[in-house]
Amino acid sequence: GVGEKPRVRLDEDEVEQLRQCRGRFQQLTGKGYFDWCMLDANPRMGGHFLWSYNDYNRGAEEETMFCGVVDVNRYPKFSYYMMQSMRPKEVSQPGLYQGPMVFVASFNSSGDYITSTTDIPVFSNCDEVRLYRNGRLIGKQTREDQKKEYGAIIEKGGSPLYLFNAGGYEQGELKAEGVVNGKVVVTHSVRTPEKPHHVRIVVPSHQVRPVADGSDMIPVYFIVCDANGTRINDSKAEITIDVSGE
């Protein structure tokens, strides 16, 4: 991998997650340190694809390659949503994503992190993004505002990185609004994690009906949550699982 932080584990903190995203933005804008890392900035290139989508076990070494936008179990990192913001807001894929999107790339977890204080990242393919903390507007930015920094990406249909400065830290909710033609069309919120309360089990189907004959394998996620249902990203809790049946 190339760039500031090409590899990041899912359990690393929110700043490290952002560093992987920022490295990919630098490659698109021509600030990568290899010639081919000028994908959108190079007028001869009309598109790009990502290697690798997921983290994977390396055949030559024991260490896992953590360069994916999802982990080995296909659970999304922040960079997954960064890549999702590059698609046109008019494009939908039933069961996977719907048109306009916005994502707050922060856990709002600590005043020690720039991603919860002075550089709160938001990914969106909308015309304008507004960010609120506990109901108060932090700021709003448009695609047009970002053309100086991300002009090459925007000109080819992609989306910029929106960074908001809250001036400090406050526990609670960060809420982003995606605006198209002056109307809020999509929102995303994150809350400061509190004490562990319960385990939520998620079985993503991806529109696949699994058959218990050994031919299908799907991930099952056990997520440690607080009383509000907020995922506790840095939980070190041990979970015992008993499975029965054939």
Task: Set out the residue ranges of the language-model regions.
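Extended substrate-binding grooves/exosites of carbohydrate-active enzymes
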Residues: G1-Y169, E173-K183
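Short, solvent-exposed loop/linker segments at the N-terminal edge
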Residues: S109-S116, Q207-I218
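Beta-strand-rich structural segments
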Residues: I120-S124, S215-I232
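Short, well-ordered beta-strand segments
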Residues: R136-Q141, K236-E246
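Extracellular Ig-like/FN3 beta-sandwich strand-entry sites
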Residues: Y169-E173, S215-M217, K236
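Edge beta-strands of extracellular beta-sandwich domains
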Residues: G182-E194
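Low-complexity, acidic Ser/Thr/Pro/Gly-rich terminal tails and inter-domain linkers that flank the onset
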Residues: P193-D213
